[in-house]
């Protein structure tokens, strides 16, 4: 078939990065339409992509007859309306997290997709495509480590925008460890407890940073996560598996190591997620494009190759429990419907 024609909605930092990725590194696709609530930004991005045009209304962009599939990099509060429009138009969509900003609307999206009988929504949990995470998953599934027991995780950022608040550390940062836990362990998460250590004096006023998250699965596996988003250093993500027959670590800084001033050594730390997970994003998008093109060519009922709407709903449910725990200081049980109760979820 000819190249997949994609509309990218939202061309801020992440969306613009995806436009560049789709236009230069991903095979079998072209960016046909872009949209952003800052229209001058959309026009600037479109001008750099041959044949790309701006559509001012996001719902019109989704319905455009020259668009085969959609990438959502818009603000989270707009996702539910835009996802439902994609379902109405039966257009495959890669939605950056969150699926939606609350549990009820996320569940509604899952149910609406299931009613169609076609899997159209993929959620952008890119770590599943990172070569290190993928390798660890393969080794776990092959039984190389015996029984997995514990995950120790670190999630650090150099700084956050002025609009950031304490709950966003759960909803925007911890959400990735939530998906990693479910991906590696093939289990839902049963409970979350957010601890509040001594705040970083350098954090913006009113932000509880760092935070420690403790998550437990129904089988008793333990996950602890250090969340520290104002380190002033760089972007650091690490995951250590502790298991019956050994341990494994993801995210060690094993690039170039420089020895300079006598008695010191060091290397580079990724400045942000685009650098650390650039390869993961490339793999994610190439596989998504291939899945959508295959679905269109064959009339398949599945246009995804990665995290589904259910995974987005599960993450929303865990993060809601995390926000409740942050406020109350106690462990909170994760409340979810049974997946089996939704035929096709």
Curated annotation (Swiss-Prot):
Its EC number is 1.1.1.18. One of its GO terms (biological process) is inositol catabolic process. It holds the Pfam family GFO_IDH_MocA. It comes from the Bacteria. GO terms for molecular function: inositol 2-dehydrogenase (NAD+) activity; nucleotide binding. InterPro entries: Gfo-Idh-MocA_inositol_DH (IPR050424), Gfo/Idh/MocA-like_OxRdtase_N (IPR000683), GFO_IDH_MocA-like_dom (IPR055170), MI/DCI_dehydrogenase (IPR023794), NAD(P)-bd_dom_sf (IPR036291). It catalyses: myo-inositol + NAD(+) = scyllo-inosose + NADH + H(+). Keywords: NAD, Oxidoreductase. Disulfide bonds: none annotated. Homotetramer. HAMAP family: IolG. Involved in the oxidation of myo-inositol (MI) to 2-keto-myo-inositol (2KMI or 2-inosose). Belongs to the Gfo/Idh/MocA family. This is Inositol 2-dehydrogenase.
């Amino acid at each position: 078939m000819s190249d997949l024609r994609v509309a990218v909605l939202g061309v801020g930092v992440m969306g613009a990065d995806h436009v560049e990725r789709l236009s230069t590194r991903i095979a079998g696709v072209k960016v046909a339409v872009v949209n952003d609530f800052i229209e001058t930004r959309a026009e600037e991005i479109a001008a750099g992509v041959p044949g790309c045009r701006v559509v001012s209304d996001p719902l019109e962009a989704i319905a455009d007859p020259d668009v085969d599939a959609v990438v959502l990099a818009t603000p989270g509060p707009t996702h539910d309306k835009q996802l439902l429009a994609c379902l109405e138009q039966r257009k495959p969509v890669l939605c950056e997290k969150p699926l939606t900003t609350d549990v009820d609307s996320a569940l509604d999206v899952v149910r609406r997709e299931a009613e169609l009988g076609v899997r159209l929504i993929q959620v952008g949990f890119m770590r599943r495509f990172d070569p290190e995470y993928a390798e660890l998953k393969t080794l776990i599934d092959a039984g190389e480590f015996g029984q997995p027991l514990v995950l120790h995780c670190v999630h650090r950022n150099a700084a956050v925008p002025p609009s950031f608040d304490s709950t966003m550390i759960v909803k925007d940062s911890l959400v990735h460890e939530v998906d990693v836990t479910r991906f590696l362990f093939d289990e839902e998460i049963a409970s979350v407890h957010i601890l509040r250590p001594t705040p970083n004096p350098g954090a913006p006023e009113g932000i509880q940073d760092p935070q420690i998250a403790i998550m437990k699965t129904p089988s008793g596996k333990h996950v602890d996560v250090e969340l520290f988003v104002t380190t002033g250093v760089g972007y650091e993500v690490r995951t250590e598996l502790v298991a019956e027959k050994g341990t494994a670590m993801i995210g060690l800084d094993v690039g170039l190591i420089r020895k300079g001033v006598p008695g010191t050594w060091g290397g580079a730390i990724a400045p942000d997620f685009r650098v650390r997970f650039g390869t993961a994003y490339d793999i994610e998008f190439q596989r998504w494009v291939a899945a959508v093109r295959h679905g269109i060519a064959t009339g398949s009922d599945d246009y995804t190759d990665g995290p589904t709407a259910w995974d987005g709903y599960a993450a929303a449910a865990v993060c809601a429990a995390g926000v409740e725990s942050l406020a109350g200081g106690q462990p909170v049980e994760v409340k979810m419907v049974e997946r089996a109760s939704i035929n096709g979820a």
